Amino acid sequence: MQSIAQILASELGQPVQYVENVIALLDEGSTIPFIARYRKEQHGSMDDTTLRKLEDRLQYLRNLDKRRQEVKSAIDGQGKLTEALTAAIDSAATLAEVEDLYRPYKQKRRTRATVAREKGLEPLAQLLLAQEKDCPAPEAAAQAYIDPEKGVETAADALQGANDIIAEIISDDADIRKALRGLLMRQGRLRSLAATEEDSVYRLYYDFEQAIPKLAGHQILAINRGEKEGLLSVTVLLDREAALPALRRAVVKPGSAAMEFIKAACEDAYDRLIYPSLEREARSALTDSANEGAIGQFALNLKPLLLQPPVKGHVTMGLDPGYAHGCKVAVIDGTGKVLDTTVVYPTYGERQKREAIAKLTALCKKHGVAHIAIGNGTASRETEQMTVEMLRGLPGVSYMIVNEAGASVYSAGKLAAEEFPDYDVNLRSAISIARRLQDPLAELVKIDPKAIGVGQYQHDMPQKRLDEALCGVVEDCVNAVGVDLNTASASLLGYVSGLNGTTAKNIVAYREANGAFPDRKRLLKVPKLGPKAYEQCAGFLRVPESKNVLDNTGVHPESYGAAEKLLALCGCGDEDVRRGAVDGLMRKVQAMGEAKVAEEIGVGVPTLRDVVKELMKPGRDLRSDLPAPILRTDVLDMKDLKPGMVLTGTVRNVIDFGVFVDIGVHQDGLVHISQVCSRFIKHPSEVVAVGDIVKVLVLDVDEKKHRISLSMKQVKE
């Protein structure tokens, strides 16, 4: 039997030794970001996505192994565990297969077969099921089991009981279930019909049928939701005449007097027990698969949203639009500190709009506002139009529509109250919107990732699994970027490798009590932050003020000695690194030979390359290499759009059937999957990601339905 490491190595296409090393590191308490970044030699430079896949599968396989032991123990307790059964359980590759093998031994609720066994009909059932050549005719065999005291009045009663027992035995056969399950998933079809006469968003599925292998995840989730709301009735179809021959081949033995009786028992087993059970299993498996796909897509969409390039160092105005309570306004400086707040009412009429423009213009001039961030919620359109009007008198100021999802939840929560105790709840959301433009990652980590809203059907998914996946993405992003130890909030620090909510708060408390951290080493004085946590977190925390320039890089303290040796070897010093005067470091290393230099300074080649990269750009932010967000000074109206126009936009969401693009008209346009590119793709994420800047051609505009159809593939380069 293969070990877990061997199974994972085969699935991931990695050497067994690398997989074993990763398992050992995980078991020692190392985090995925730490392993991905600082233990490359031990796993061949697997990326964080592969490592998370490995971790997920490791958990599944360990649960599978645990369940195998539980099942064997339970069967052994009944005195029925054989060598063959042990081998079958040990080689079962999925939890479903283990449960199939356990099924005959599982304590069941009272079934028709249980009642028949209580009437003493088990021997008759076994006699007929054996289908020996000398087996008597069923009617004759049944005579011996007539017993009115037990409720078996006639031979027909005895045969009915025997049939019930045989049907259950057939239904509990693991090989039969596996074969029919495979047939259903290959050849089955899912059908949904209207359960109501009223129109609804599920009208596409009012008369829908599709082969199971061809079903898209978004179709499964939509059908599930429609069924849950009582608007759809759903069935799984499988050609009975295709399934029964496979079942008969496994059970029926030709030439026996019991053959026809067993054929009938097969049909009863299929119709009454096997098919309803497999239909439930198929629906569950389809839902699980669709959920995993949707969670994966949510994670894929979340990552670029978190890694949006910051627009730092500029005074920014945040506008949280609204009707009843007006438009909330906050002005923050280049570090995110609040300078001013107010409320204006541009939607209350022309006079109030003029007053709002005058008030905001005065604020912009007073504080030297460079950028305006407008939330994309209620009244955003009117607020954007007012802003554009205002900017005609403010040259050099630009604006951007910011996704405000989760801002209201955050502003009303405990975290915002702790951060801004002196500000009204409504004004806190305006501060958050302004900060989202300045540093999206630092602000978005304060919000439950599910509330950011870049997925499909996220409320229908298993929430624990969704949380795990999304928190993993946030963790990967935070650690990939790195965190300033002296300015980061507890929310941001909490996602750093090796830290948790408690140690993150302790860092902030220590900083407030003792002043800025002079270097990384001082972290060891923080309560509850021991050597293991320090090992895991130190490399991801930056201290720009430190006397040691390496404290402002991604070089881990364990590699400081190697970095210093490398600098000496290349004739450079700390000051050269600080001044950015080591541009030719990689060339020097390559000229000397990477393997030779790595050996000389005592690290592996992957670590050497990372150290060189960090020394060449201390304090670098990987987000600065990504396309900058589009800042606008003017706005288009939907009525301005004409088919054939080519516009530049930002990808806001990527889902199974297409891509939503913000083209500056307040209503996102849809690029259907068929219009994403000229070649065939299974999913738009093969081509684009959230945050990408793309050129699109306007295909159609429906003002009544607020729909804009776009194409990427028809844009001529």
List each language-model region with its residue ranges.
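Long, highly charged, low-complexity intrinsically disordered interaction regions
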Residues: 4, 56, 62-80, 90, ...
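Short, ordered loop/turn segments at secondary-structure junctions
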Residues: 38-40, 129, 239, 321, ...
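Structured, non-catalytic alpha/beta "coupling" segments that mediate domain-domain communication
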Residues: 74, 88, 99-102, 226-239, ...
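Duplex nucleic acid-engaging cores and interfaces of nucleic-acid transaction enzymes
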Residues: 50-53, 60-318, 322-423, 430
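Short flexible coil/turn linkers enriched for glycine and charged/polar residues
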Residues: 15-16, 28-29, 95-96, 121, ...
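A glycine-rich phosphate-binding loop feature that marks nucleotide/adenosyl-phosphate handling sites
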Residues: 182-189, 319-323, 377-379, 402-409, ...
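Single-stranded RNA-binding regions, centering on S1/OB-family and related RNA-binding modules
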Residues: 543-717
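Generic start-of-chain signal for non-secretory N-termini
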Residues: 1-20, 27
